[in-house]
Design a protein with these regions (language model features):
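C-terminal extensions
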Residues: 1-8, 12-92
């Protein structure tokens, strides 16, 4: 069984963020929405997160749900499109 730390884009910082979000398994991560995770992390930490955190969340949720590992930066364009449409913004 794959551990969170086995996912391509999960390092120490992301693993710590996932713990803050009470996500401890790949199975728990697979059903998540990257935007919800990003907003919840900002809410729980009361800190404005770097938008690239969303990119990492998108990449790891994708890998957890499909098994396909992608580079986190391949999600940047999608996030920027969401930002332009007003569907992604900071809550802090």
């Amino acid at each position: 069984m794959k551990q969170l730390s086995d996912l391509k884009n999960v390092g120490k910082a992301t693993l710590a963020d996932l713990r803050i979000l009470n996500i401890y398994t790949v199975e728990e991560l697979a059903d998540q929405d990257p935007t919800v995770l990003f907003h919840e992390l900002e809410r729980r930490t009361q800190t404005k997160q770097d938008p690239c955190v969303w990119d990492v969340f998108a990449a790891i949720v994708h890998e957890a749900s499909t098994g396909e590992a992608t580079n986190w930066w391949s999600w940047t364009e999608k996030r920027k499109n969401l930002q332009k449409k007003g569907k992604f913004q900071h809550i802090i």
